[in-house]
């Protein structure tokens, strides 16, 4: 009996140890930190038409508008469990919402789904009355705008009748430059230029995503899912130029353009970590894994010890 229990507990411990790396890696992902949000104010023209005479029109219009946005966000959240990117248009007889969500390509599907759920909450809480919004978290982002439907009784059933956002022009949207500088480190600018140049070709080969370490820099680059390969490379090239200009001596920087974003982190005294190393995330995976495994093993051996004592006591009672 004791031998059987020991065997069972040993197998359980082995399964736990095998699953721990993925659990710890997932828990490390800083996917839900807000990077920035932009909510454009509500346009009064959306709430009323000059030809409208009904006093209840504004309330009804607000309801239909909120309904369209809610349907749009629900669809994105639902699809995020199966896809890392979705560009779509959803609406009713008065309003349509066009836009997309995108998750960081190397994050697991469950993290993508959680991240888009957070986007939906932030949008509802902070941008509920906006005509357009852009929300970026560390692990995903959301962009949408309202499309005016002027035809009475029009239904948004055929997406080809309505335009989504046009091809981006790679304009600067947001930047984050670390306050610490690398001015005293020789060769920093050249190293960053080489690392970001590698990202330009990397996103083309990687179908819009690149994450790698180059010498003492860690670089992450990604284009929006609807951006073609050649445009993606050009966008990252523009982002690299913006990083050199806007964050010249910063040891870490993030540049967000229309269509893509790029981030880099400089590690002058250590080699960058592998995948999932993001700005501000420096968790020691090996140490965490050792602590957890040790704790689980201790619990298992304590359980075996008590079972052994119980077995001896039972034998004594039988005598």
From Swiss-Prot:
Q: Where is the Gnk2-homologous domain?
A: 45-149, 170-269
Keyword DNA damage appears in the UniProt entry? no
**Keywords on this record?**
Cell junction, Cell membrane, Disulfide bond, Host-virus interaction, Membrane, Repeat, Signal, Transmembrane, Transmembrane helix, Transport
| Pfam families referenced in this protein's UniProt entry, alphabetically | Stress-antifung
Its GO CC terms are: plasma membrane; plasmodesma
Q: Which cysteine pairs are covalently linked by disulfides here?
A: 39-127, 103-112, 115-140, 177-247, 223-232, 235-260
Spell out which residues lie on the membrane's Cytoplasmic side.
310-319
Tissue specificity remark: Highly expressed in seeds and roots.
This protein's membrane topology, according to the annotation, is: Single-pass type I membrane protein
Key word Repeat present in the record?
Answer: yes
According to the record, the segments passing through the membrane are: 289-309
> Signal peptide span per the entry?
1-26
Q: Where in the cell is it found?
A: Cell membrane; Cell junction, Plasmodesma
Extracellular compartment segments: 27-288
Recorded superkingdom: Eukaryota
InterPro entries the UniProt entry points to: Cell2Cell_Antifungal, GNK2, GNK2_sf
Residue ranges for the region (Necessary and sufficient for plasmodesmal targeting) are 289-309
- Which purpose does this protein serve, as stated in its record? Modulates cell-to-cell trafficking.
Q: How does it assemble?
A: (Microbial infection) Interacts with Grapevine fanleaf virus (GFLV) 2B-MP.
The entry assigns this protein to a family as follows:
Belongs to the cysteine-rich repeat secretory protein family. Plasmodesmata-located proteins (PDLD) subfamily.
User: What name does this protein carry?
Assistant: Plasmodesmata-located protein 4
Q: Can you name the source organism?
A: Arabidopsis thaliana (Mouse-ear cress)
Top-level taxonomy:
Eukaryota, Viridiplantae, Streptophyta, Embryophyta, Tracheophyta
């Amino acid at each position: 009996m004791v031998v059987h229990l020991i065997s069972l507990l040993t197998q359980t411990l082995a399964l736990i140890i095998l699953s721990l790396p993925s659990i710890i890696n997932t828990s490390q992902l800083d996917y839900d930190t807000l990077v920035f949000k932009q909510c454009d104010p509500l346009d009064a023209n959306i709430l009323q038409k000059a030809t409208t005479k009904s006093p209840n029109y504004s309330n009804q219009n607000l309801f239909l508008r909120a309904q369209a946005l809610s349907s749009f966000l629900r669809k994105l959240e639902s699809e995020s469990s199966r896809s890392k990117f979705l560009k779509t248009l959803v609406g009713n007889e008065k309003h349509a919402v066009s836009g997309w969500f995108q998750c960081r390509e190397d994050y697991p599907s469950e993290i993508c789904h959680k991240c888009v759920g957070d986007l939906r909450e932030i949008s509802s809480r902070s941008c509920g009355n906006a005509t357009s919004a852009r929300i970026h978290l560390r692990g995903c982002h959301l962009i949408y705008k309202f499309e005016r439907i002027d035809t009475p009784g029009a239904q948004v059933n055929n997406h080809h009748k309505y335009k989504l956002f046009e091809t981006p022009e790679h304009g600067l949207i947001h930047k984050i430059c670390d306050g610490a500088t690398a001015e005293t480190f020789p060769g920093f600018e050249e190293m960053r230029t080489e690392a970001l140049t590698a990202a330009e070709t990397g996103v083309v080969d990687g179908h819009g995503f690149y994450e790698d370490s180059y010498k003492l820099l860690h670089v992450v680059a990604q284009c929006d899912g609807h951006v073609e390969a050649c445009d993606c490379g050009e966008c990252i090239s523009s982002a690299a130029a913006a990083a050199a200009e806007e964050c010249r001596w910063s040891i870490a920087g993030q540049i967000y353009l229309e269509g893509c974003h790029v981030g880099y982190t400089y590690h002058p005294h250590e080699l960058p970590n592998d995948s999932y190393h993001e700005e501000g995330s420096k968790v020691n995976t090996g140490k965490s894994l050792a602590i957890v495994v040790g704790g689980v093993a201790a619990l298992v051996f304590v359980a075996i010890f008590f079972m052994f004592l119980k077995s001896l006591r039972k034998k004594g009672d039988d005598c």
